[in-house]
Amino acid sequence: MDGKTDVKSLMAKFNTGSNPTEEVSTSSRPFKVAGQNSPSGIQSKKNLFDNQGNASPPAGPSNMSKFGTTKPPLAAKPTYEEKSEKEPKPPFLKPTGVSPRFGTQPNSVSRDPEVKVGFLKPVSPKPTSLTKEDSKPVILRPPGNKLHNLNQESDLKTLGPKPGSTPPVPENDLKPGFSKIAGAKSKFMPAPQDADSKPRFPRHTYGQKPSLSTEDAQEEESIPKNTPVQKGSPVQLGAKSRGSPFKPAKEDPEDKDHGTPSSPFAGVVLKPAASRGSPGLSKNSEEKKEERKTDIPKNIFLNKLNQEEPARFPKAPSKLTAGTPWGQSQEKEGDKDSATPKQKPLPPLSVLGPPPSKPSRPPNVDLTRFRKADSANSSNKSQTPYSTTSLPPPPPTQPASQPPLPASHPAHLPAPSLPPRNIKPPLDLKHPINEENQDGVMHSDGTGNLEEEQESDGEMYEDIESSKERDKKREKEEKKRLELERKEQKEREKKEQELRKKFKLTGPIQVIHHAKACCDVKGGKNELSFKQGEDIEIIRITDNPEGKWLGRTARGSYGYIKTTAVKIDYDSLKRKKNTINAVPPRPVEEDQDVYDDVAEQDAPNSHSQSGSGGMFPPPPADDDIYDGIEEEDADDGSVPQVDEKTNAWSWGILKMLKGKDERKKSIREKPKVSESDSNEGSSFPSPHKQLDVGEEVYDDVDASDFPPPPAEMSQGMSVGKTKAEEKDPKKLKKQEKEEKDLRKKFKYDGEIRVLYSTKVASSLTSKKWGTRDLQIKPGESLEVIQSTDDTKVLCRNEEGKYGYVLRSYLVDNDGEIYDDIADGCIYDND
C-alpha cells in the first residue's frame, strides 16, 4: 500500500507546475550503474525506504528499482556546478579512482537547493563508454552510496547535454568510496524532504519533448543527450539513468521492450500525464506498428529475439521503470511487438513447420481420354483435359498453410493456372517423326507423357537456337576466312603482277625444267639468292640477260640465275621439250611449206575426219599448248569435234587478220633460223623455237593467254644466236650492254621484238652516221625492231648494236612481203 500512496503523491505533484530551475536543482540525481542487482538488494532498499516514514520525496528514488535511499546532506560535498564555477578546468579530464564517472569527490558539499543551474559544458561520460559497460553482476553496495551517486549522476545529466571525452572508470574503482559514504548514512534521511519542499514537476510541457527526441536518442544511441529534455518527473530520470548503462547500443529496442513491464511495486504501472500529452510518440508507435505489419520477416526475427533475450538478461526488468513517458511508450511498443504476430496473416515459421514436399511427377499419363474428348467435343477439349493435366502442378502454387485441394476442384476454376496448351499440335508434330521411325507407336501406347513431350519440345527449340548460334558463328568464321583468302589472293596477285612487270613475263608461268644449285649465290637486285643443293625451277630460258635464266625457288621468290651456277640435265630437258611440243612441230613444217602440205601432214592423225579436212585440217585443241601428247588422242575424235575445231579455226583466222601485218614478214627468214637450229641441235631451245613458229599458224589461234607470236618469233630468232653464243660469255655481256643502251638512248620500253628481217641495199655508199644511226654495210642483214616513221626504222645488226636506218638504204621488198601476206589471206579465206 505504501507503493500506491507514493504513486498517488507522484501523480498529484506531477500535475502541479513549478519553476523549472528549482526542479532541476532539487531533483534527485541518480547515477548510472552497469550491471544487475540481485532481488535481495531490491527488497532491502524497499524496506529501508519504508522506514523513512511517509515523506513524499520518493518521487524520484522510490520509483527506481534500485535507489531506496535519500540524498546526501547539503553540507557534505560541493556540487558539480559549484566546483565548475570555482575551477576553470572540469574535474573529469583526469580520471581518479571514483570521480570520473560518477562525479563524487571526497570533500564535496551538497549543492544549495535554491541555486539555479547554469548549463555549462563540462566533460561528461561518452555515450559509447556508457553503452559499453558490461552487464556483470555488481557487488551489493550500501544504500547511502547509491543515493549519493544517484545525486551526482542526476547532476551530470542535468549539466551535460554534450558528451565529453573523459573515459569511464571501471566499477571496481568505486569500492574505496563506499566506506566514506556509508558513514554519512544517518545524515541522508532529511535531504529528500527538503528537496520535496519545492515542487517536483516545474514544467509540465517538458514531458512532451521526449516524444520528439526519442527517435534521435535511438538513432544516436546516446542516452545522456535525451536526459535534459526528459525531466517531466524524477521517475523519468530514474528510468533513464538506470536503464541506459545496462543496455548495449545495438540492443536498445529489445532491452527496453523487456525492461518496461517490471516495476518496484508488483502489479502497478504508472502512466503519467506527460505520456498522454505526447502526440509525436504515439504517431511514431503507430508508424512502427504499420512497419511491423508490412515487414513480416523482421517481426518474426524480433519475436525470436524476444524469446531468447530473457535467458541472456534474466534480471533486466529490475533495471528499468515504467513511470516515464519514454518507458511507457517502450512498454506499449513492447506489448505491440509481442502481440503483432497474432495479427499477421501468416504465422511464424516455428508454428508452420517445414513446408510440404513437392509432389513428384506421375511416371505415366494416359491421354486416351483427351483424344476421345477431342474427337467427341472439339469445343470442350480446352476444359476437361487441362483440368486433369494440371492436377500435379497446383499444390506448389497454393499457399503452404492451406490443405491440398480435392481432385475435382480444378474443374470448377474459371481458367487453369497455366496458360492453355493445345494438345493436338504436339501430337501432329510428333506423329510424322514417329511414323518414320516406329510406324504409329503413338497410337498404340497412348502418345506417352504430355509433360515429357513438351519438355522435349522445349529442348528441341533450345537446340534449334543453339544451332542457329552455331550457324551464325560458322558464317562469321567463313566470312573471316573468305576475307583472309581474298586478301591473300589479292596479295599474291599483286606480287605476281609486280613480278610480271619486273621480269616482263607474259602468259601463264610454266616450269620448263628443274635444276639444282651447285654453289651458294647471294643474289642482287633482280638476281635470285639460293644455297648449294637447293632445287630451282627454271621459268624462262629466253629473253633474259646474257648467261642468265629466270628461275624460282621453292619459297616462291623469282630472280635471274646464272647458267653456270646450276646443274642442268640437258638430255632430260630436251626430251621434255620434245614431248611437250610433240604436236606443234608438225604445223611448223607445214607453215614453212606455205600451208599447202598441212592437210597431208595432219591426215594420219585424222582418219575419221570428214572430207573437208583436206582443205583445212582442224586446228589443235584449246589445251594443245599445255597437253601436247594428250592432244593426239583428242584429235582422233568424231565429227562433232571436227565441227567445233573448224569453228575455233574460223575464229582464229579473224584473230590472225586482226594482228599486225608484219607477222608474216619473218616467214622468209625462217629457213635460216631452222638451219641454225639444226646446227645447234644438241641445245634444247630449238623445239621451243619450232613451237613458236607453229603458233604463227595454229597455236596463236587458240592460245589467247600465251605470249603473242611475234615476241616468241623474235625469241626463236635470237635463241639460236644466244645459245650459240652461250659459250662466249663476253658476247652475252656485250649484248646486255647494247640492250641497256637501246633503252636508255632510244627510250625504248617493253620487250625487244623483231618485226621482220631485211638487208641493206648493195648500192649503199659509205657516209657519215649520226649518234643514233646504225652503222651498216652494203648487203648486211638487219632485224627491224620498230617502225619509227615513214623514213626510218629501228634496226639491230648481227653484232647486236641498235640504231636508226633510213628506209631508202634497205632492199625494197615490201611489195613481196605484202603480196605474201595477201597470199596468206587468200589461203586463210579459202
Swiss-Prot record:
GO process terms (BP): integrin-mediated signaling pathway; protein localization to plasma membrane; T cell receptor signaling pathway
Residues the record lists as Phosphotyrosine modifications: Y570, Y698
Ranges of compositional bias, category Acidic residues: 450-464, 621-636, 693-703
Spans annotated as Interaction with SKAP1: 347-447
Biased composition (Polar residues): 15-55
SUPFAM superfamilies: SH3-domain
Keywords: Acetylation, Cell junction, Coiled coil, Cytoplasm, Nucleus, Phosphoprotein, Repeat, SH3 domain
Location of N6-acetyllysine modifications: K13
Gene3D superfamilies reported for this sequence: SH3 Domains (2.30.30.40)
Positions with biased composition (Basic and acidic residues): 79-89, 248-259, 284-296, 330-339, 465-500, 660-675, 722-739
Gene Ontology annotations for the cellular component aspect, listed alphabetically: anchoring junction; cytoplasm; nucleus; plasma membrane; protein-containing complex
Motif SH2-binding per UniProt: ranges: 461-464, 595-598, 626-629
Function comment: Acts as an adapter protein of the FYN and LCP2 signaling cascades in T-cells. May play a role in linking T-cell signaling to remodeling of the actin cytoskeleton. Modulates the expression of IL2. Involved in platelet activation. Prevents the degradation of SKAP1 and SKAP2. May be involved in high affinity immunoglobulin epsilon receptor signaling in mast cells.
Protein name: FYN-binding protein 1
Annotated source species: Rattus norvegicus
Gene: Fyb1
